[in-house]
Structures are given as C-alpha cells and as structure tokens.
C-alpha cells in the first residue's frame, strides 16, 4: 500500500514530531493498494480450503502464469518482480532465479503440491510429481543425489543457463516435512487413525496411481515397525469413481477386516507397535 494522503504530526508548539527512524511522523488519511506480482504462497495456502472443482480451476490458472517454469516443469516462488520497488523486501535484491527471487524454493513448491492431493486433485498431483519431485529429476541437471532435497533450485529465468534446475544448499528443510505429509496422503489417505463410536479405527484409504504397484504390490513402513503391503492385481488406481477397493485386511494370514479399516483392539495393537506386518488386498 502507498500513502496518497497524509498530514504531518507536530507537537503543541508546531514542531515536527520525529520518529525513532529520524523521520517526521505522519498520520495517513488514505492508502492506495498496489497489487504485487503473483506469489506461489497464495494458492499454496488457499487450495487447502476450497472444494475440488475450485481447486482444479485454480491449478489450471496457476499453471498458465509465470509461476510455472515451463522449462523445468516446476513452480517458482513468484512471477517476475523486476518492476517492484526494493521497499517490497530483500528478495528484489537477488538475481532472478536465485536465492529468494523467482527460484524454485523447494519447501514452497512442495507445500503447493501437497495442497493438490489434499484438495482431491489426484490426476493433477501425479502428473506434477513425475516432473517436480526431486527423485524424478535428472541427476546431471540437479547436480547432486536425487535422494536429498535442496533449499532451492535455480529457475530458468536465471541468466546463467548452466545452473538451470541445479539444487543448492542441501539440507533437512521444510520440504522434508511436506514430503512426509504427501507420503501419508498417498499411502494411507490422510486420516490414519480416527475414533468412531468409542473405538479406535486404523484406516487404509490410499490414493495411489497404478504405476506405483510393482507386479501388483507396493510395500511401505507404518509407524516405524509395521510393513504394510498393498496387493492390487486389478491394474486400477486406488482413488476416484473407478478405483480398486479394499476387499480384506490380513495380519499373520488371518483376515481381520473386509473393508479398508481395522477397528477396536486390533487397531490399538497396531498403534502400540505390536504388529510387524499387514497385508491389504484390493479388488
């Protein structure tokens, strides 16, 4: 906002009142809103609070803006801020596509991608992660192991083409937290444990693309101690109207449920780390 109408602040003697900045104080009477360029943080936060259709429309519109780096198929922190004043913050001081300015800040991009799956944009989510998640990148471009995250990647607006897509400052950043949240949404459906009618419920409601199943199976570790294997020989995805559905859940070869949840004492046993393996079958 810019102050377009204001009056100086003076004391009882008419002398200017000076602030701790060494400048005269003023009482603003009117502001003018000056829109900033697009920043990814807006849709990353908003997408989690709207319905699926609104989220889908938002996804399409964001992808049509300069927030989307077409060369890298990844999302930048903002569109060009070249016309912004330095008053808008330190990000303006950096070279475009570097550090905080128009780069692929991994934590923010992952936050946006997580919002996709939470909003029910499963097809859009899987189309995005095969290009934007670090394990899917070309290691030669990324410049380091694709098993580790970076603070940021230089985007294609950087004047040095040799570093486009290269990761800088490898560390355990906020992107790791967002990745764990994505993993939970994919493997369990987000609500791992719930409480229904006075009983603990362990829910199996994965949102998995069919290509994630290797010979009809995918295995992951739950709560650090329990290996969960999904058996899906249908060739179907596990989300949407035509998804494969859970037919039974087995522990030690014994069927403990005929739907996608374990209820009561057995759910408590799993939560307490006393179960080493669970097999979930789809049909």
Task: Tell me the role of every PLM-derived stretch.
Residues 1-283:
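Acidic, mature catalytic/reactive cores of soluble proteins
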